[in-house]
């Protein structure tokens, strides 16, 4: 196993521990807590894949970080901060919406690009709105935390979420996953509308009618993919 992979995991574990302490002391906001829960799942998945104990890795990570801080100067820190662009966090969903349990009568799911797409194929003739929480860098979606599909009465009927044990995903991965989800829901005559944030940061355009900015050709292609999988 590559030593850099182990070191990276150990440091990530310790930094997660520090962030958890902040959360326990009520020193962080809702987006911070969102990322904390997501990263906890990711660390558990990585630990299982690498065969490493999280507690031991956290202690080793602490030693590595402490050694680095001993040689770190304020000037180096200022330079690092100035040269690194800071991502923004976009929230369509509240904490309640993103953490609510939901169930499917006719479950269908697909893995694509490190993302899990889930949808209830029993849903028909509904108006559905897509909402998502994600980070943005350089005015483009960087990392998806969660995307969920809601009916007008607030019921959750579909979801896209990162798979903790798999490597990260790209903007194209997210767009493809959304296309699969839309195709599957529209196959049952549902009407889909994406939030303005999804339209702006995933595709960089806005549809005047509030619909998902997918060309008809791409919608039909995604629908055929879902039909073949179902």
Curated annotation (Swiss-Prot):
Coiled-coil residue spans: none
Cite the residue spans of the region called PABPN1-binding: 223-230
Which molecular-function annotations from GO does this UniProt entry contain?
protein serine/threonine kinase inhibitor activity; RNA binding
Q: Which InterPro entries match?
A: NS1, NS1A, NS1A_effect_dom-like_sf, uS15_NS1_RNA-bd_sf
One family from Pfam that matches here is: Flu_NS1
Q: What does this protein do?
A: Inhibits post-transcriptional processing of cellular pre-mRNA, by binding and inhibiting two cellular proteins that are required for the 3'-end processing of cellular pre-mRNAs: the 30 kDa cleavage and polyadenylation specificity factor/CPSF4 and the poly(A)-binding protein 2/PABPN1. In turn, unprocessed 3' end pre-mRNAs accumulate in the host nucleus and are no longer exported to the cytoplasm. Cellular protein synthesis is thereby shut off very early after virus infection.
Give the multimer and partner information: Homodimer. Interacts with host TRIM25 (via coiled coil); this interaction specifically inhibits TRIM25 multimerization and TRIM25-mediated RIGI CARD ubiquitination. Interacts with human EIF2AK2/PKR, CPSF4, IVNS1ABP and PABPN1.
What is stated as this protein's family in its record?
Belongs to the influenza A viruses NS1 family.
The domain section of the record reads:
The dsRNA-binding region is required for suppression of RNA silencing.
Q: What's the protein here called?
A: Non-structural protein 1
Gene source species: Influenza A virus (strain A/Duck/Alberta/60/1976 H12N5)
